[in-house]
């Protein structure tokens, strides 16, 4: 069942520059405190959805051109929401729950921890402080970061697709590729991500197959309110 679902998802989202990776809810819940658990049985089939560098041209630009007569407040979020929600149409006989990376609970917690989901699904390795044996940071708070074996840091985790009626007790877990395997490189990665994230150098911690285009880099480095003009939009398209 998982293979049939995955095949349909790849067919629908792959040409738009998205990747999907399967996991069981239980794998995710097992590594988190109960407050962060997804409220589904352990064997429930889920997929984490990533956007790759090509999503900008394959999905975002066509979406903006098609929707430019409607109100657009956040082009990327609305594009991702449109395409992930459209997945329900290819599974008319299945219940599909969609959780987006920007959604939060009333408690202000995120609805899911994106990097944990990517790690347990084998999509991208989540490097954290505990992965560095000789910790040089003392009392400083250090955030972890996912690195994709093909795109390095040039990707984003966009959401989850959950299939509450599909149980996959025999799904085998794939470990993420440990592509930043040395102590020195892991330290450098966390240093760059935590203290120099704006220059984007952490994204190239490994040799990547594809990165954001110059146009895309400019778009994401521009303050959100000013991004509209880069896509030929006014602040709110009416």
UniProtKB/Swiss-Prot annotation:
Coiled coil: none annotated. Pfam families: MMACHC (PF16690). The keyword Cell cycle does not apply. Its cofactor is FAD; FMN. Monomer in the absence of bound substrate. Homodimer; dimerization is triggered by binding to FMN or adenosylcobalamin. Heterodimer with MMADHC. Cobalamin (vitamin B12) cytosolic chaperone that catalyzes the reductive decyanation of cyanocob(III)alamin (cyanocobalamin, CNCbl) to yield cob(II)alamin and cyanide, using FAD or FMN as cofactors and NADPH as cosubstrate. Cyanocobalamin constitutes the inactive form of vitamin B12 introduced from the diet, and is converted into the active cofactors methylcobalamin (MeCbl) involved in methionine biosynthesis, and 5'-deoxyadenosylcobalamin (AdoCbl) involved in the TCA cycle. Belongs to the MMACHC family. This is Cyanocobalamin reductase / alkylcobalamin dealkylase. It comes from Gallus gallus. The lineage of its organism: Eukaryota, Metazoa, Chordata, Craniata, Vertebrata.
């Amino acid at each position: 069942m998982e293979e049939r679902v995955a095949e349909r998802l790849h067919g629908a989202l792959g040409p738009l520059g998205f990747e999907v990776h399967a996991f069981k809810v239980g794998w995710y819940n097992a590594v988190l405190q109960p407050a962060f658990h997804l409220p589904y049985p352990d064997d429930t089939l889920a997929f984490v959805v990533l956007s790759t560098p090509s999503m900008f041209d394959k999905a975002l630009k066509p979406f903006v051109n098609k929707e430019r007569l409607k109100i657009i407040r956040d082009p990327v979020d609305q594009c991702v929401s449109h395409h992930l929600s459209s997945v329900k149409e290819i599974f008319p006989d299945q219940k599909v729950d969609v959780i987006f990376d920007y959604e939060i609970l009333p408690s202000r917690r995120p609805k899911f921890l994106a990097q944990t989901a990517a790690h347990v699904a084998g999509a991208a390795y989540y490097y954290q402080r505990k992965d560095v044996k000789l910790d040089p940071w003392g009392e400083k708070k250090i955030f972890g970061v996912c690195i994709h074996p093909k795109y390095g840091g040039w990707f984003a985790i966009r959401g989850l697709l959950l299939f509450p009626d599909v149980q996959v007790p025999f799904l085998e877990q794939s470990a993420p590729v440990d592509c930043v395997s040395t102590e020195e490189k892991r330290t450098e990665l966390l240093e760059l991500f935590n203290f120099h994230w704006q220059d984007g150098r952490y994204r190239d911690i490994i040799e990547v197959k594809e990165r954001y285009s110059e146009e895309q880099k400019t778009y994401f480095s521009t303050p959100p309110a000013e991004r509209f003009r880069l896509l030929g939009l006014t602040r709110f398209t009416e």
